[in-house]
Swiss-Prot record:
Residues 300-603 form a coiled coil. Keywords: Coiled coil. Transmembrane segments: none annotated. Residues 639-659 have a biased composition (Low complexity). Residues 469-482 have a biased composition (Basic and acidic residues). This is Coiled-coil domain-containing protein 157. Residues 469-490, 617-690 are annotated as: Disordered.
Length: 718
């Protein structure tokens, strides 16, 4: 058998066998329903879901590849085993359904993976069970036939009928109902039990009778044929849609299998259900594809609309550019016309110069004849001629320098005018030289003594003529260069105009941004000034709170506690540090004040006032009352706190209902606490009034300070 491996005839035979096996399996599935067992060839897939068409197309005979052909032959053999095993499993399921009198079992999950031997044993056991049932039913069938023939004899001329025909006559399959599955053609044999009771009613016998099948049916159901015809047409449309969209079609593969197995026969119910499932798969695939296409088409439409808008804008820009180009072309035409006019003028001037040079040549020939006669006198004058040549060279160098300076001074736009001016200047020089030549001829004719000067002037004229020729050629070359420079300048001017427009737009935007930034800076400066004022006020308030803690609310009420205890303690530590710093400064001031008071007391300038003169008469009879605001202000001046009236009125102090203020530093008798004035004792401070003395001492020590703010009584708000 090894030499047959890869043979095309063997592979074709196996392919035909696989096609027949698959058709038989589909027929069994249409009667017993699909069985879901793992495939023997592909254990990870269900056997009934294998795509046999794709497998047969893939594993085929390839003439140029013997290895793949042998592999395909082996795979086809394995597929034959797989299909035979699936056929045995489906037949076993069909036999089980016959034994339990149920043709279409309910849907069930995939079964376990079974070997070939186990599947064959199961099939044989089911077949034996069916044989036993049939053997048990045969004697009952014979007994029933005998009882029917005894109890109900046949009429004359009427043929004897079997019990199967009698039961099939009265027991008919149900009529097809629209909307239900088409099972009228899928049932090949439905067992029906008919119970016949004996006259005595003591025994009950049953018998299996088979109903009408597809092969024995005389007329097929019209509704089924019409529905299946429309189903075929819809399937063709769905397959064509999938092919047009380059999508795989599950229904197409299933349709090929149905055509190969059933042809044009009516489809059974299970096949119709499988058909509907495959068709729904294709429809869902088409729906997803259409959804993806709509998602792609949406942004493309938006991009198309944007492109059309941009196209309109570009058309407008092109029209504007065409208008600008036409204007520029008109300007260039006008400029070329002007250049042609100037060129014609230059040509005319050149012709005039040529005619004049011809006249000069004739005159020079005449003069040369005269010069031949006067050669003897010329030789004597050669030294002077050399000097004149040097002067001529200097003159030419000076003229060249003048020309260079003129070229540097003139602008690029006026070089053409400069060239024309040079040509005119050359013509005027020629006129002058003509006059000089005429005068020289007249002088030569009239005065021979001036012959030497004429010869010198003649040499100068020759040199100037040559220089004029060279200058004329240079002027023509300069004119061509100036034309090229003019064109380049025009292009540069256009570019500079474009750059100027862009810079102007940029300048406008920068100015707008500058104005916005100036507005923002002014707003920020205002906010900064306000914040600085608030900061100064808060600093002043903090200093007052630290300096006069007794005049304000308790510290426990002022501290706003947060959820973080450590943060509150840190804030309290910072406040205490600030308070300690301020108190240290106050201690220094008080120490300096005490030193000054001691110095004044030692000098004898401090006077003691009796205690009886301290208080005014209205306050003598009140016990526990505080002294007037003047004494309180003097006492506050003793501490060295030089506050303005506004800052002192801003502090909050406690006031009795009677209008008299009390301080926690006061004694119960209404007198201030003890003060150590220099070396004075406690008895002296009690008997004398030190407040007025301190006030007088303060006035003596600070005469320039305003005393009104110290003695003016102030009312603190309650």
């Amino acid at each position: 058998m090894a030499h047959l491996l890869g043979s095309q005839a063997c592979m074709d035979s196996l392919r035909k066998d696989l096609t027949d096996l698959q058709g038989t399996i589909v027929d069994v599935f249409s009667r017993a329903g699909p069985v879901r067992f793992p495939s023997w060839k592909f254990p990870d897939r269900v056997a009934c879901d294998l795509d046999m068409v794709a497998l047969l197309e893939h594993y085929d005979h390839v003439p140029g590849d013997p290895e793949f052909t042998q592999l395909s032959h082996a795979v086809l053999l394995e597929l034959v085993i797989d299909r035979l095993l699936l056929l045995l499993q489906s037949c076993a399921s069909y036999l089980e359904n016959l034994s339990v009198e149920q043709m279409m079992p309910p849907a069930r999950a995939a079964g376990p993976c079974m070997s070939v031997g186990l599947t064959v044993r199961r099939f044989w056991s089911n077949l034996l069970r069916l044989g036993l049932l049939y053997q048990q039913a045969v004697p009952q069938k014979r007994a029933n036939q005998g009882e029917i023939s005894i109890t109900k004899p046949t009429a004359k001329g009427e043929p004897a009928r079997s019990p199967e025909c009698m039961t099939a006559k009265f027991i008919k399959p149900p009529s097809p109902v629209p909307g239900l599955p088409l099972i009228c053609q899928g049932l090949q044999s439905i067992p029906v039990r008919v119970s016949l009771r004996s006259p005595g009613g003591t025994s009950e016998k049953t018998k299996s009778v088979y109903s009408q099948t597809v092969e024995t049916a005389l007329v097929p159901c019209d509704a089924c044929t019409s529905v299946q015809g429309s189903l075929w047409e819809v399937g063709k449309v769905v397959i064509s849609l999938c092919q047009s969209q380059n999508l795989p079609s599950s229904l197409g593969q299933f349709q090929k299998l149905v055509k190969d197995s059933l042809g044009l026969k009516p489809l059974p119910a299970a096949t119709v259900g499988h058909w509907a499932a495959e068709q729904s798969k294709d429809l869902t695939r088409l729906n997803k594809h259409v959804g993806a296409l709509t998602q792609l088409v949406g942004p493309l439409r938006a991009q198309l609309e944007d492109a059309e808008g941009q196209k309109d804008g570009l058309r407008k820009q092109v029209s504007k550019l065409e208008q600008a180009l036409q204007q520029e072309q008109g300007q260039r035409q006008r400029q070329t016309e002007e250049a042609e006019r100037t060129l014609a003028k230059c040509e005319h001037d050149r012709h005039q110069l040529l005619t004049e040079t011809c006249d000069l040549k004739t005159k020079v020939a005449v003069l040369e004849g005269d010069l031949k006669q006067q050669q003897k006198s010329i030789q004597a004058m050669e030294a002077k001629a050399q000097q004149l040549e040097e002067e001529g060279e200097r003159r030419a160098a000076a003229e060249r320098q003048v020309q260079q300076l003129e070229e540097q001074v003139q602008l690029l736009a006026g070089r053409l005018d400069g060239a024309s001016q040079q040509i005119r200047w050359a013509s005027t020089e020629l006129d002058k030289e003509k006059a000089r030549v005429d005068s020289m001829v007249r002088h030569q004719e009239s005065l021979q003594a001036k012959q030497r000067t004429l010869l010198q002037q003649l040499d100068c004229l020759d040199q100037e003529r040559e220089e004029l020729r060279g200058s004329l050629d240079e002027a023509e070359a300069q004119r061509s260069e100036l034309e090229e420079q003019l064109q380049s300048l025009q292009s540069d001017r256009e570019q500079e105009q474009c750059q100027l427009q862009a810079q102007q737009e940029l300048l406008q935007s920068l100015q707008q941004e500058k104005q916005d930034l100036e507005q923002v800076t002014t707003d920020l400066q205002l906010t900064i000034s306000e914040l600085r004022q608030q900061l100064e006020e808060l600093k002043e308030r903090e200093r007052l709170l630290v300096a006069f803690p007794d005049l304000h609310q308790p510290e426990e009420a002022q501290i706003q506690s947060s959820s973080n205890v450590t943060q509150d303690m840190e804030r309290q530590v910072q406040a205490n540090a600030i308070r300690i710093q301020v108190l240290q400064e106050e201690n220094k001031r008080l120490q300096s004040m005490l030193t000054k008071i001691r110095e004044v007391a030692q000098q004898g300038g401090l006077k003691m006032v009796p205690q009886g003169q301290l208080w005014s008469p209205p306050y003598k009879g009140i016990q526990g009352a505080t002294p007037p605001a003047q004494a309180q202000s003097a006492f506050s001046g003793l501490t060295g706190r030089r506050q303005s009236p506004g800052s002192r009125t801003s502090s909050t102090g406690r006031t009795h209902p009677g209008g008299l203020r009390t301080s926690p530093s006061r004694q119960p008798g209404g007198l201030p606490s003890k003060f150590s004035l220099g070396d004075g004792s406690h008895s002296a401070s009690c008997t004398q009034n030190p407040i007025r003395a301190l006030a007088r001492l303060r006035r003596k020590l600070s005469p320039n300070r305003q005393a009104g703010s110290t003695y003016q009584p102030q009312e603190r708000p309650t």
